[in-house]
């Protein structure tokens, strides 16, 4: 039986009463709570601007939020315990990877160097896992990074991000540049990682093809509020809809209608009203 490295931790991700805002802006999250068990594959869904990327970055330890117990990954503080990321136990792959070098900031991955130079430059890697990922992502080690397409560059970056056997993986729209075959093969690899090693994955995406049988959990965010968090097979709407896309589309359309109703009517300024803007005419 395969060893489940992360199974010793019942709650792989735990967020308790989280509040967060950027600078002096209104809070994005207020009293936000989320619990995910080890081995789960959670889809994170919501409209653009709902807070998905911010939540993933908080879970990845990129933003400090409250005390050490507010955001816990593998029973450790996501922000304060830097060993989580340094050890590879916690890994984050975001959309910015298509143009930047991981934690190296805004350094473009378009220099004249090979895919082999990048992939084999990561030390302490299991050769079998490395070869498996190279084959899985159909990477040509002779690719020159300044000449490849965005999709090919994305494959190299995903490979580098998965070389260390993670325990918690946070994915933010990482498959947008991949073709159908590469995307489905990668999802199958992720599923094996969860089932065989007990790893936990949170995946934010707007592409829902094939995810009905892939995900184990779903979390739906609207305006920084967790509207739903449940096992996929316990969501009532899925039992009466043809697919996941239809369900999420209905949720997003519903929240759009509510937003339109709550928008304030524009203030109309009349020449007969006392107004600073009309002082010119008086």
Curated annotation (Swiss-Prot):
It comes from the Eukaryota. GO terms for cellular component: cytoplasm. InterPro entries: AAA+_ATPase, ABC_transporter-like_ATP-bd, P-loop_NTPase. PROSITE patterns: ABC_TRANSPORTER_2. Induction: By sucrose. Transmembrane segments: none annotated. Residues 13-248 form the ABC transporter domain. GO terms for molecular function: ATP binding; ATP hydrolysis activity. It is found in: Cytoplasm. ATP binds at residues 46-53. Belongs to the ABC transporter superfamily. ABCI family. The keyword Methyltransferase does not apply. Pfam families: ABC_tran. GO terms for biological process: response to far red light; response to red light. This is ABC transporter I family member 21. SUPFAM superfamilies: P-loop containing nucleoside triphosphate hydrolases. Expressed in root elongating zone and root meristem, as well as in elongating etiolated hypocotyls. Signal peptide: none annotated. PANTHER family: SKFA PEPTIDE EXPORT ATP-BINDING PROTEIN SKFE. The keyword Nuclease does not apply. Keywords: ATP-binding, Cytoplasm, Nucleotide-binding, Transport. SMART domains: AAA.
């Amino acid at each position: 039986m395969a060893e489940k490295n992360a199974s010793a931790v019942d709650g792989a991700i735990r967020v308790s009463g989280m509040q967060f805002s950027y600078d002096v802006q209104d809070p994005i999250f207020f009293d936000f709570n989320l619990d995910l068990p080890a081995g789960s594959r959670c889809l994170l869904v919501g409209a653009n601007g709902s807070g998905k990327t911010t939540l993933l970055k908080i879970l990845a330890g990129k933003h400090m939020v409250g005390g050490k117990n507010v955001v816990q990954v593998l029973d450790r503080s996501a922000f304060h315990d830097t060993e989580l990321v340094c050890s590879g136990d916690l890994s984050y792959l975001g959309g910015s990877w298509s143009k930047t070098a991981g934690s190296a900031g805004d350094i473009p991955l378009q220099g004249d160097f090979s895919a082999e130079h990048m992939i084999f430059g990561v030390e302490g890697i299991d050769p079998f896992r490395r070869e498996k990922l190279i084959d899985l992502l159909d990477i040509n080690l002779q690719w020159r990074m300044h000449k490849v397409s965005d999709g090919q560059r994305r494959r190299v970056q995903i490979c580098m991000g998965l070389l260390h056997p993670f325990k918690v993986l946070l994915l933010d729209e990482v498959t947008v540049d991949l073709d159908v075959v590469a995307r489905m093969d990668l999802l199958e690899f992720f599923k094996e990682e969860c089932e065989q090693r007990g790893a936990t994955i949170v995946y934010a995406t707007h592409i829902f093809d094939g995810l009905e049988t892939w995900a184990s959990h779903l979390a739906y965010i609207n305006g920084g509020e967790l509207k739903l968090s449940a096992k996929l097979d316990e969501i009532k709407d899925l039992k009466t809809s043809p697919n996941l896309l239809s369900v999420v589309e209905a949720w997003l359309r519903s929240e759009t209608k509510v937003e339109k109703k709550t928008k304030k009517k524009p203030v109309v300024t009349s020449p007969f009203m006392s107004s600073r803007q009309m002082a010119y005419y008086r």
